[in-house]
Structures are given as structure tokens and as C-alpha cells.
């Protein structure tokens, strides 16, 4: 487990530290592009992650400010199909499913099949 943590830290630091290229004479062509506050925040985050790993906690138990915001798919409403009377939907199950899937709401086949029964 120690080797995996070391590899994780190396990968995180190399991918999180962007470098800018400068062609000034007498300077290294690569210099860190992070400000000291950003570097300190990165070190603090890595320290917290390593401490949690050492305690045996899963990585999902991170502090709330370190979690990524969850992306939720917006709910799509289909007024033109959902508000049609049941009698008009019963033009045949296949026709109903076809109209439901092509109404522009982005419903799946299973969702349309459930609505049409």
C-alpha cells in the first residue's frame, strides 16, 4: 500500500503543478506557475488525503470543501406527450413508444414503454 500512495502523490503533484515555458537567458526554461497560496493549499490537501489513507478511511470521506460538486441531469418534462389523453396514446404500443421517444424529451425506451402501458 505504501508504494501505491507514493505513486498517487507523485502523479497528483506532477499533474497539479502546471509549468510555464520562459526563454529568458540565465533562467530555467521551466518555472512553476503556481502562487505560494495555491501551492500551500495543494500541500495541505495532499497531507489531509495521506492522513486519511493512513487512518484506513476510504477516500470518499473527504471534507465537504474538497469534494467535487455532483452533476445532476436536469429533469426533462414532456408536456406534448405526457398531457395527451390515454385514448390517443393507445394507437398501438409501438406507435406510442415511437411518439414518446421522438417527442424531444430524451426519455429512454424503458421509460416510454412504462408510460405507454
UniProtKB/Swiss-Prot annotation:
Cellular component terms per the entry's GO annotation: extracellular region
Record field: compositional bias (Basic and acidic residues): 62-80
Tissues and organs where the protein is expressed, per its UniProt entry: Expressed by the venom duct.
Prodomain positions: 23-90
Domain of life, per lineage: Eukaryota
Keyword annotations: Cleavage on pair of basic residues, Disulfide bond, Neurotoxin, Secreted, Signal, Toxin
GO molecular function, one term: toxin activity
Disulphide bridges, residue numbers: 96-116, 100-112
Subcellular location: Secreted
N-terminal signal peptide: 1-22
Region Disordered: start-end pairs: 53-86
Keyword Protein transport: no
Miscellaneous comment: Negative results: very weakly inhibits potassium channels in PC12 cells. Very weakly and reversibly inhibits Kv1.3/KCNA3 in HEK293 cells (Ki=12.1 uM). Does not inhibit Kv1.1/KCNA1, Kv1.2/KCNA2 and Kv1.3/KCNA3 when expressed in oocytes (tested at 10 uM).
Notes concerning its domains: The cysteine framework is XIV (C-C-C-C).
Recorded family membership: Belongs to the conotoxin R superfamily.
Protein name: Conotoxin vil14a
Species whose genome carries this gene: Conus villepinii (Villepin's cone)
Phylogenetic classification of the source organism: Eukaryota, Metazoa, Spiralia, Lophotrochozoa, Mollusca
Amino acid at each position: 500500500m505504501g508504494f501505491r500512495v507514493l505513486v498517487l502523490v507523485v502523479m497528483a503533484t506532477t499533474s497539479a503543478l502546471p509549468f510555464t515555458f520562459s526563454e529568458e537567458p540565465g533562467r530555467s526554461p521551466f518555472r512553476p506557475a503556481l502562487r505560494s497560496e495555491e501551492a500551500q493549499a495543494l500541500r495541505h490537501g495532499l497531507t489531509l488525503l495521506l492522513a486519511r489513507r493512513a487512518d484506513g478511511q476510504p477516500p470518499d470521506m473527504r471534507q465537504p470543501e474538497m469534494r467535487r460538486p455532483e452533476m445532476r441531469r436536469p429533469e426533462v418534462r414532456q408536456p406534448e406527450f405526457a398531457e395527451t389523453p390515454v385514448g390517443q396514446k393507445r394507437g398501438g404500443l409501438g406507435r406510442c413508444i415511437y411518439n414518446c421517444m421522438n417527442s424531444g424529451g430524451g426519455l429512454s425506451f424503458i421509460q416510454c414503454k412504462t408510460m405507454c402501458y
